[in-house]
Amino acid sequence: MIVSGLSGSGKSVALKTFEDLDYYCSDNLPVELLPDFVRSRLRGNPLGDQRLAVGIDVRSRSDLTQLAQWRQAAQEYGIEARLLFFEASDEALLKRYADTRRRHPLSQLGLALPEAITRERELTAPLRAQADAIIDTSALNVHQLRRRVVTEFALGNSDRLSLLFESFAYKRGVPAEADFVFDARVLPNPHWDPELRPLTGRDAGVRDYLDKEPDVIRYSAQIVDLLDTWLPRLRNDTRSYVTIAFGCTGGKHRSVYLAERMARHAREQGWPEVATFHREQD
């Protein structure tokens, strides 16, 4: 697993999570040293079943464009190197640097923080372009990010397609990593029922309310039809992860309900790796 992205976006949290899950981790490794590093680890483990996670970013001052060539060569030898790219909005990164008072790695070039962030986006663009998954952490805290890594990536089997059903609030932005986005704001809102307002889409009261609504029944059936038609096509693609996101006003009732309902349907259809993530609740 190759972990890359913008400074302050959560790469260190991701690597620590992989380490806790028994990955052998190395951070800030120059791209040109990656082949020797992998070979040395495999020689020390003849069975070849050791899980590795490597952090690569602008701190190494490497030619990041070399990574694509190495991944292609590694694949020819039966080594799958998946690339996760972490990013966040400028606003989120600026706030995190203000809170931690850390220096940006590119500040040594004499750049102000906003300029350093912009320059880093340019330098890491080749990595972002070839990423297997892009994770926007702007709206995530440390605990949410850790849970996200565990549920969507760390427990996955590399030869199977992992599905993540995510709920979110539109007022906090659409998840940048979403492959499919469905707007649940067209559905009746349990928020206006005083008894249902404090509940979430995971509670029986909200489920019972929405299960009876004709628009919900029709909308859910149309989503099921679309996903049942197209998700199997992606199984034969080179991608390892698919994120299906559902949004509503507050990310509490309708979006959570749909994410849970579709995840349940996916499991019933035999998909082996299905996870849910409720951005505004978890």
Curated annotation (Swiss-Prot):
Sites where the protein binds ATP: G5, L6, S7, G8, S9, G10, K11, S12
Keyword Protein transport among record annotations: no
Superkingdom of this protein's organism: Bacteria
InterPro entries: P-loop_NTPase, RapZ-like, RapZ-like_N, RapZ_C
Keywords of the record: ATP-binding, GTP-binding, Nucleotide-binding
Molecular function terms from GO: ATP binding; GTP binding; molecular adaptor activity
Binding annotation for GTP: D57, V58, R59, S60
Summary of the function given for this chain in its UniProt record: Displays ATPase and GTPase activities.
Family of this protein: Belongs to the RapZ-like family.
NCBIfam families given in the database record: PRK05416.1
Classification via PANTHER family: RNASE ADAPTER PROTEIN RAPZ
Name of this chain's protein: Nucleotide-binding protein XCC2806
Organism lineage: Bacteria, Pseudomonadati, Pseudomonadota, Gammaproteobacteria, Lysobacterales
